[in-house]
Amino acid sequence: MRLIIGIFTLLLSICPLHKENGNKLPRLAVSENRRFLMNENGAPFFWLGDTGWLLFSKLDRKEAEKYLDDRAEKGFNVIQVIVLHQLDDTNVYGDSALIGGNISLAKVTEGNSFENQKAYDFWDHIDYIVKLAEERGLYLALVPVWGSNVRQGKVNKEQARTYAAWLAKRFADNPNIIWLNGGDAKGNQNTDIWEIIGQQIRQHAPNHLITFHPFGRSKSSMWFHNADWLDFNMFQSGHRRYDQDDTELAYGQDNWKYVRDDYSLEPIKPTLDGEPSYEGIPQGLHDPSQPYWNADDVRRYAYWSVFAGGCGFTYGHNAVMQMHKPGDQNPEYGVREYWTEALDAKGAQQMIHLKNLILSKPFFERIPDQSLIASEKGERYDYQVATRGKDYAFIYTYNGRDIKVKMGKIDGEKISASWFNPRSGKTTLIGDYENKGTRNFNPPGKIVNGIDWVLVLESIK
């Protein structure tokens, strides 16, 4: 038996021991115009997230290093991960987080040496991965407790208060932490518990950003937009097709509509899609006889939402989000490959192109501007979306339809036009044009869903 030396109620005032790192990641903040994120030095931060929900519980130290190395190499800078998925879960080393599944009773042992099995506990493993991520330039967006536990009545208000305070204090000095309150949760249910968790994190980790990860086809702004603890909004556009969406909003796959809604709210807060359809998961989520979402789909979600005004985007893959590996007894959602194979999925490799495109131009001045499009914007897969700064504009088409542009929206008497390929990241010059009137641009190739293009317009000075 391990020596249990603490419970949350006794640990609230105890700070964990961490190695000092002379090259700490800068903390994150909301930009001055409240539309975007930046680091504490004022540099742009484009959120490019990956979904690694079960990183802490399913991967050992070497596997975690492999995963984080890969995501850093592919340009991701945020990993979304759950601290407590189920209250009785154990990690890959057989360690449980809690005493008796009670969220207010931590199972913490003396020491943290990996060579000593009695010392290295569940929380030490998380500490180790947090530091691994920081060393690779990665931020971890932590869900304190998955929403199903709260829905099922396994967490009461006092337990939530104790746990959230302890957890926030434990990681308060780690610069690479972001908080995702909720966790596939409806904020109008158990609202008092979600408010308590948000307030405790804000009180005890005041330098960390906080948002709320909501239930599918809903958004944090529906319940918490005015909460003092909520720094930016997040929505989950979810995993359903147009014909599968039976919600009141009925936005289906049009995730740009969530951004449009949040963009109009006061006070101004950044927003992003924190869970679109995952690559490699059945359409509708639960029935593996349905078609599976692919790289074309996740690109569409990414460009639609970011060009509509989003401050970033979170990608996900079915196998990676659940860290599916050989020997898993209950793999979920029709998963067809192991996480190690899915690391190189096409969509995961293509996400960096969006990040590079956005960061190639002045970041904080960018706005959505549909008035650039002189023709019909289109519906569903025909929808075109435009964004611009003072001397540049991007217009996205998912299927290569002609783009008719109302010129004169950016500075300069002349503009240079080019095609940016979201599948490869390559740019092809079209030519120079007078910056007035309207002009039609015909993308390369046929009109086919998934043959997507970004029209890039730049002022010639």
Where are these regions (language model features)?
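Short, flexible, glycine/charge-rich loop motifs used to bind or transfer phosphoryl groups or to couple energy/partner
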Residues: 14, 69, 167-170, 200, ...
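Active-site mouth of glycoside hydrolases
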Residues: 25, 30-244, 254
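Aromatic- and carboxylate-lined catalytic core of secreted/periplasmic carbohydrate-active enzymes
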Residues: 267-271, 278-282, 294-431, 444-461
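Generic structural signal for beta-strand residues in well-ordered domains
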Residues: 28-30, 170-172, 203, 223-226, ...
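Bacterial Sec-dependent N-terminal signal peptides
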Residues: 1-22
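Non-catalytic accessory regions flanking glycosidase/transglycosidase catalytic cores in CAZymes
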Residues: 19-74, 389-391, 405-406, 410-430, ...
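Extracellular glycoside hydrolase catalytic/binding regions
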Residues: 176, 182-322, 331-337
